[in-house]
From Swiss-Prot:
<keyword id="KW-0496">Mitochondrion</keyword>
<keyword id="KW-0813">Transport</keyword>
<dbReference type="GO" id="GO:0045275">
    <property type="term" value="C:respiratory chain complex III"/>
</dbReference>
<keyword id="KW-0249">Electron transport</keyword>
<feature type="transmembrane region" description="Helical">
    <location>
        <begin position="77"/>
        <end position="98"/>
    </location>
</feature>
<dbReference type="GO" id="GO:0008121">
    <property type="term" value="F:ubiquinol-cytochrome-c reductase activity"/>
</dbReference>
<keyword id="KW-0479">Metal-binding</keyword>
<feature type="transmembrane region" description="Helical">
    <location>
        <begin position="226"/>
        <end position="246"/>
    </location>
</feature>
<dbReference type="Pfam" id="PF00032">
    <property type="entry name" value="Cytochrom_B_C"/>
</dbReference>
<feature type="transmembrane region" description="Helical">
    <location>
        <begin position="288"/>
        <end position="308"/>
    </location>
</feature>
<keyword id="KW-1133">Transmembrane helix</keyword>
<dbReference type="GO" id="GO:0046872">
    <property type="term" value="F:metal ion binding"/>
</dbReference>
<keyword id="KW-0999">Mitochondrion inner membrane</keyword>
<dbReference type="InterPro" id="IPR016174">
    <property type="entry name" value="Di-haem_cyt_TM"/>
</dbReference>
<protein>
    <recommendedName>
        <fullName>Cytochrome b</fullName>
    </recommendedName>
</protein>
<keyword id="KW-0472">Membrane</keyword>
<dbReference type="InterPro" id="IPR005798">
    <property type="entry name" value="Cyt_b/b6_C"/>
</dbReference>
C-alpha cells in the first residue's frame, strides 16, 4: 500500500516540499535562515493576532491600549515584546539570508531571487506600519517624516501624501489604515513565501560550492529537519533572552511618550533594521535624490544577477570577491551606525562616503574584481 503522504492531495504537497524533497548533501547552516524566517513569520502572525484583540486603532486610545496590553492583559507584556523583538529577529535573519544568497551566488535562480526582493520590500512596509501603531512620539514623527518623502515625487507628490494620510497631516485616518494594512500584509507575505518556495523547488537549492547538486541529493527529512530544528532552538533562545532580560534594548525611549504633534523629538530615527537605508537617504542633500537612493539601496539587489560576469557561481574559491563582500558588510554596519547619529559633522561626511562606497562596490568594484579573477584563472 502506498503511503498516504504520497497520495493525499494536500499531504503530497507537504511531502514534496518538506519530507521527500531532494536537497543537496552539502548545504551548510547558512541555508537554515529560510526555515527560521518561516518560524519568525509564524511567531509574528500569532503574537500580532493576540495583540490585535486588545489594540484600538484610534489616536486617542492607541497609546493607552498598548499600555493596557502590557499592564492588564494576562501575559500581555510578553506577547507585546515577543512581537516587537520578533521583528528584529525577522530582519536579522532576512539580512543574513540575502547575504548568503549574494555570497554563494543564489541570485542566479532569477524568479526565486526577484520574489525574495518583493518579499523584502513587503516586510519592510509591514514593519514600518507596525512601528506607527503604538502612537508614541517616534511612531508619529517617523510616520510623518517617511510618508512625507513621497512629496518629492514630481507633480503628484503632494496629492499622494495627502491621499496616504487621509487628510492634511498624520492623524486618525492614517492610523486606522496603517493598522488595516499591517494586519493584512503578513498574510500576503505568507502567500508570497509559497510562491518563493514554488520557484525554489522548480530548480532545487544552490549549494556552497555553486556546482550542480543533481548527482548527490538526500531527502530533506530527517537530515535537514533536525538541522533546522537546531537553528530554531538558537533563534528562540536569542529571542527569549532578549524579551526576558532586555526587551527595550532595540527600541527607542521616545516611544514611551504619547504622540505629540506640537513637539518634535531631537533625533528622529527608525528602528535599527532601517538605519542603513535612512543613512543613505540623509547623505544626499536633494529630497528627490535621497528618495531615489533610498529605494535603490534595496532595488539594487535586482541588478546583481545582471552584473554577474564571473565564471564561478559561488565566492567560496574567489578570495578577492570575498574581501569585497566583507568590505560591503562592514560598509553596511557603518551605514547602520551613521543612521542612528545626529545630522552633524563628521557623521554626515562618513555617511556620504559610506553611501558612495555601497553603490560603487555593488555596481562597479565587485563586477570588476570578478573580471580580474576570470583573467587570473585564464577563463
Amino acid at each position: 500500500m502506498t503511503n498516504i503522504r504520497k497520495t493525499h492531495p494536500l499531504l503530497k504537497i507537504m511531502n514534496s516540499s518538506f519530507i521527500d524533497l531532494p536537497a543537496p548533501s552539502n548545504i551548510s547552516s547558512w541555508w537554515n535562515f529560510g526555515s527560521l524566517l518561516g518560524a519568525c513569520l509564524a511567531i509574528q502572525i500569532i503574537t500580532g493576532l493576540f495583540l490585535a484583540m486588545h489594540y484600538t486603532a484610534d489616536t486617542t486610545t492607541a497609546f493607552s491600549s498598548v499600555t493596557h496590553i502590557c499592564r492588564d492583559v494576562n501575559q500581555g507584556w510578553i506577547i507585546r515584546y515577543l512581537h516587537a523583538n520578533g521583528a528584529s529577529m525577522f530582519f536579522l535573519c532576512l539580512f543574513l539570508h540575502v547575504g548568503r544568497g549574494m555570497y554563494y551566488g543564489s541570485f542566479t535562480l532569477y524568479e526565486t531571487w526577484n520574489i525574495g526582493i518583493i518579499l523584502l520590500f513587503t516586510v519592510m512596509a509591514t514593519a514600518f506600519m507596525g512601528y506607527v501603531l503604538p502612537w508614541g512620539q517616534m511612531s508619529f514623527w517617523g510616520a510623518t517624516v517617511i510618508t512625507n518623502l513621497l512629496s518629492a515625487i514630481p507633480y503628484i507628490g503632494t496629492d499622494l501624501v495627502e491621499w496616504i494620510w487621509g487628510g492634511f497631516s498624520v492623524d486618525k485616518a492614517t492610523l486606522t489604515r496603517f493598522f488595516a494594512f499591517h494586519f493584512i500584509l503578513p498574510f500576503i507575505i505568507s502567500a508570497l513565501v509559497m510562491v518563493h518556495l514554488l520557484f525554489l523547488h522548480e530548480t532545487g537549492s544552490n549549494n556552497p560550492l555553486g556546482t550542480s547538486s543533481e548527482s548527490d541529493k538526500i531527502p530533506f527529512h530527517p537530515y535537514y529537519t533536525i538541522k533546522d530544528l537546531l537553528g530554531l532552538m538558537f533563534l528562540l533562545l536569542t529571542l527569549t533572552i532578549l524579551v526576558l532580560f532586555s526587551p527595550d534594548l532595540l527600541g527607542d525611549p521616545d516611544n514611551y511618550m504619547p504622540a505629540n504633534p506640537l513637539s518634535t523629538p531631537p533625533h528622529i530615527k527608525p528602528e535599527w533594521y532601517f538605519l542603513f537605508a535612512y543613512a543613505i537617504l540623509r547623505s544626499i542633500p536633494n529630497k528627490l535624490g535621497g528618495v531615489l537612493a533610498l529605494v535603490m539601496s534595496i532595488l539594487i539587489l535586482a541588478i546583481i544577477p545582471i552584473l554577474q560576469i564571473t565564471k564561478q557561481r559561488s565566492m567560496m574559491f574567489r578570495p578577492l570577491s570575498q574581501i569585497m563582500f566583507w568590505i560591503l558588510t562592514a560598509d553596511l554596519f557603518t551605514l547602520t551606525w551613521i543612521g542612528g547619529q545626529p545630522v552633524e559633522y563628521p557623521f554626515v561626511t562618513i555617511g556620504q562616503v559610506a553611501s558612495i562606497l555601497y553603490f560603487s562596490l555593488i555596481l562597479v568594484i565587485m563586477p570588476a574584481v570578478s573580471l580580474i579573477e576570470n583573467k587570473m584563472l585564464k577563463w
